């Protein structure tokens, strides 16, 4: 019985992780560099940009756009093979 509960929890966690998506700094498609932003306008630029990339929302964090709830296939800074070419 306990094993069944553990398996059920594992399946639920896997499904929820896929549904919620991933978070990260979105990158320019041509350079793989982060989108820079003004930290004093935390949501104004980044939220629409992130939503255009498929995220739930986004905000300026450490002078770059951090997106929340991105689709798994969206490339973010730090993914394997993402290097800024600028």
From Swiss-Prot:
Keyword tags: Disulfide bond, Ion channel impairing toxin, Neurotoxin, Secreted, Signal, Toxin, Voltage-gated sodium channel impairing toxin
One of the GO BP terms on file: defense response
InterPro entries: LCN-type_CS_alpha_beta_dom, Scorpion_toxin-like, Scorpion_toxin-like_sf, Scorpion_toxinL, Scorpion_toxinL/defensin
Chain ranges of the LCN-type CS-alpha/beta domain: 22-85
Keyword Protein transport in record: no
SUPFAM superfamilies hit by this protein: Scorpion toxin-like
GO function terms (MF aspect): sodium channel inhibitor activity; toxin activity
Family: Belongs to the long (4 C-C) scorpion toxin superfamily. Sodium channel inhibitor family. Alpha subfamily.
Domain remark text: Has the structural arrangement of an alpha-helix connected to antiparallel beta-sheets by disulfide bonds (CS-alpha/beta).
Entry protein name: Neurotoxin LmNaTx35.2
Species of provenance: Lychas mucronatus
